[in-house]
Amino acid sequence: MEAGNNEWPAAIGIDLGGTKTEALLLSADGSVLFRRRRPTPREEGYEAILGRVAGMVREAAAELPPSASYTLGIGIPGSLDPVNGLVRNANSTCLIGHALKSDLERLLGHPVRVRNDADCFTLAECRAGAGKGYGLVFGIIMGTGCGGGICMDGQVREGPHRIAGEWGHYSVDPQGAECYCANRGCVETLISGSGVEAAFFRDFGERL
């Protein structure tokens, strides 16, 4: 692709989900220049996921002129510890305890911004989607896991532990299925994709 100058502003976004990973390259006006979706290799572990993300970023960046600049952001199904920068609270548990941000920056040689995927989704809806114009927006993600984000006055409210909107780990059944967070009967164990799949297996002995 060609650009009008050597400093062509663009943005690469990665949605790192429990089931799939998607890469998107946007021009300055928001036009989609590149989109790719691949399975998240979480059964293969952290290094495989790291390689998958880095490879997809390189694919997207290859669509730009060699001298073009871009920003890079990644939404993850968890959060980064504000003290040590390690991943925590992730439903893809192989990410937990790893320095995803610094590892990707080392592999790519490029600054990386990492945020909770539900927070990213909620902020987008707040500023340019269904929540535009509202003072308080609560966004819900229901996929492999079950996440949530809160925006007030156009800003994400993460809370001191960066999990303010994470409604998926409220226990609604103390005797329910065990969750990876060590609690029982979390909302996520009941209505997320993985929760529904597990419930079907318990009841019918078959995998969806």
What does each model-found stretch correspond to?
Residues T19-K20, C120, T144-G147:
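Conserved A3 ("GATE") glycine/threonine-rich loop of ANL adenylate-forming enzymes
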Residues E2-A10, L24-S27, F34-R36, E44-A48, ...:
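Glycine/GP-enriched mid-protein hinge/lid loop-to-helix segment characteristic of carbohydrate kinases
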Residues Y46-A54, R58, A62, A68-L72, ...:
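Glycine-rich phosphate-binding loop and adjoining helix at the ATP-binding site
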Residues E22, G73, S79, C120, ...:
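Residue-level recognition of specific faces of alpha-helices
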Residues S31-V32, L80, V87, V156-R157:
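Hydrophobic "anchor" residues
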Residues G75-I76, N91, M142, S192:
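A secondary-structure boundary/capping signal
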Residues N6-I76:
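Conserved phosphate-binding loops in N-terminal lobes of ATP-dependent enzymes
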